[in-house]
């Protein structure tokens, strides 16, 4: 029996349309990544990233980003807070798509 992550999956999300910023539901059937539509690959990667983060202990999802929110009280200065945010920017690119999926 094939493992669950090897089977095609179906995701439904909303993508912006040209109709005054409205969103139209779109279903993506995800074949193996080599044949998938680029948008579906991006959504699947975001979903896989979130699944991996959910299985980790809730302290660190990478060597620079913390899974728990960092407050100003935990850092010595505003510039240090901004530095942490900048370091996390690249690894959190997929979260925007993930958040859009969870809202639909």
Swiss-Prot record:
It comes from Homo sapiens. It is linked to A chromosomal aberration involving DIRC1 is associated with familial clear cell renal carcinoma. Translocation t(2;3)(q33;q21). Residues 10-19 have a biased composition (Polar residues). This is Disrupted in renal carcinoma protein 1. Residues 1-23 are annotated as: Disordered. Expressed at low steady-state level in adult placenta, testis, ovary, prostate, fetal kidney, spleen and skeletal muscle. Keywords: Chromosomal rearrangement.
């Amino acid at each position: 029996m094939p493992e669950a992550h090897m089977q095609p999956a179906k995701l439904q999300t909303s993508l912006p349309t040209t109709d005054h910023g409205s969103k139209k539901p779109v279903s993506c059937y995800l074949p193996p990544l080599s044949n998938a539509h680029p948008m579906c690959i991006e959504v699947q990667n975001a979903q896989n990233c979130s699944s991996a983060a959910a299985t980790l202990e809730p302290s660190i999802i990478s060597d620079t980003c913390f899974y728990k929110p960092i407050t100003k009280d935990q850092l010595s200065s505003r510039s240090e807070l901004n530095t942490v945010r900048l370091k996390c920017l690249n690894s959190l690119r997929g979260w925007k798509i993930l958040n859009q999926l969870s809202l639909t």
